[in-house]
């Protein structure tokens, strides 16, 4: 059941990436619309995760997850029939609410329901299904978009969500934390602060860092989040136990994952466009090219979990992130003439690093969380990764766009200088060649910058996280 819940979210995130070119054609979506189709989902998910995690601890993790699955399925059904970009953005925001309710519950249930021995088996199955979603999602998305249109990438969520709800009702025991007072003020402050913060990050590429609107949003976010932190340290029943950050494994693991997610967010944005616009792959072919990264992660996930127990989560996290950085460097060496082998090799190295690092990093983080705060602890992890992904899209997307524009000929039409899709649509062979070269140049700079960022995450993990002390069983889980 946990696998089905995770699967529906994984598939949704993967299938949409290959539908972007079709959405541009069918809905007349411009670049800002495309950004908000993805960002509306991120905005509501990140803004509500902490509150959702607290609700799952208080009112029952199974109950909250079922409500989230039902909402996610309904929103997916509505999204499939959207007649405009605005409608689709609204329904994607509603899907984000459902996702926020589901995500903390799955990881917290895995921690609280299973004992140490069962948890290892459950995590192994859960991680494998997650990778099946990553492998099958892009391929399925390509087939659906090509054969049935973009709406089908949302309709596929509905039967999976229904099956997950049925399985939860039939098979899953309810779990909740001991009763404690609610923290409504903390919930409001966290929702407002996180939503405004992610909104500011999302709008960075459009407004720039020094724009008054950006500065206002950032100021509001900082003030509200400081108020949230102060309140949480003074209230008798805090929604989020901030003392968790005094644990070096929790703080080191979470911040390392944030920096890594910045890189992952940029990878999804850049690489899907590279495959389709530069190499000319169909949506199905672009989806299939994600198979190497998923397979590599599956094969190394169990190894990373096992070695994490033996040599320590700190070392395993640092080694894995270093390998991820090498993968980004290899991606930065790709060109418009790169073949399948070069692309697959770079993605395989990336997947190996992710499979080694993430189980150890998340294990260290979640082992620091008391069982009664499992939902909130999971939500903190999810929130920071969502914020990192949004930051990656904003910053690395801006780096890519700026370098693409600067590399294009000054005599090119203005739309072609800002969008490779517009450049290719003009049908000029010389302009198309220049656009592909410019995009590859921008991608190289972006990937090298990301490699440096992930390497910094490896150093952070090594310096901050605690070394292995006693061979206690680890609560291992992987998110990719």
Please annotate each region the language model reported.
Residues 23-24, 55-56, 140-148, 201, ...:
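Interfacial helix-cap and linker-helix signal at transmembrane-aqueous boundaries
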């Amino acid at each position: 059941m946990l696998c089905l819940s995770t699967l529906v979210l994984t598939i949704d995130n993967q299938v949409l990436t290959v539908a972007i070119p079709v959405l541009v054609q069918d809905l007349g979506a411009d670049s800002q619309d495309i950004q908000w189709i993805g960002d509306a989902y991120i905005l509501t998910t990140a803004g509500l995760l902490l509150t959702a995690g607290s609700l799952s601890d208080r009112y029952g993790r199974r109950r909250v997850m079922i409500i989230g699955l039902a909402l996610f399925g309904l929103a997916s059904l509505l999204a499939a029939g959207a007649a405009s970009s605005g409608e689709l953005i609204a329904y994607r925001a509603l899907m984000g609410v459902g996702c926020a309710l589901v995500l903390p519950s799955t990881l917290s249930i895995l921690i609280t329901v299973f004992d140490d021995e069962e948890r290892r088996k459950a995590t192994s199955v859960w991680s494998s299904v997650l990778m099946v979603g990553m492998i099958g999602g892009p391929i399925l998305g390509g087939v659906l978009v090509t054969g049935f249109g973009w709406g089908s990438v949302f309709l596929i969520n509905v039967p999976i969500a229904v099956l997950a709800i049925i399985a939860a009702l039939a098979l899953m025991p309810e779990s909740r934390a001991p009763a404690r007072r609610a923290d409504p003020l903390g919930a409001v402050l966290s929702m407002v602060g996180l939503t405004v913060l992610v909104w500011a990050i999302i709008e960075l590429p459009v407004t720039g860092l020094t724009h008054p609107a950006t500065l206002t949003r950032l100021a509001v976010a900082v003030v509200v989040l400081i108020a949230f932190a102060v309140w949480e340290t003074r209230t008798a029943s805090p929604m989020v136990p901030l003392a968790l950050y005094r644990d070096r494994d929790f703080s080191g693991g979470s911040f390392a994952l944030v920096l890594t997610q910045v890189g992952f967010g940029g990878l999804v944005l850049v690489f899907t466009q590279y495959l389709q616009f530069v190499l000319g792959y169909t949506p199905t072919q672009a989806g299939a090219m994600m198979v190497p990264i998923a397979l590599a992660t599956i094969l190394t996930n169990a190894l990373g979990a096992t070695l994490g127990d033996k040599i320590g989560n700190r070392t395993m996290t640092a080694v894995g992130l270093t390998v991820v950085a090498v993968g980004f460097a290899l991606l930065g060496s790709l060109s418009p003439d790169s073949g399948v082998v070069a692309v697959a090799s770079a993605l395989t190295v990336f997947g190996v690093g992710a499979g080694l690092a993430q189980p150890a990093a998340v294990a260290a983080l979640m082992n620091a969380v008391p069982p009664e705060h499992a939902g909130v602890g999971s939500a903190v992890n999810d929130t920071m990764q969502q914020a990192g992904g949004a930051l990656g899209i904003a910053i690395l997307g801006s780096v890519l766009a700026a370098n693409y524009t600067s590399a294009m000929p000054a005599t090119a039409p203005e739309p072609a200088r800002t969008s490779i899709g517009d450049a290719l649509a003009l049908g000029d062979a010389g302009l198309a060649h220049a656009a592909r070269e410019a995009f590859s140049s921008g991608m190289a700079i972006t990937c090298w910058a990301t490699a440096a960022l992930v390497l910094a995450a490896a150093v952070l993990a090594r310096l901050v996280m605690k070394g292995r002390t006693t061979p206690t069983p680890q609560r291992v889980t992987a998110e990719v």
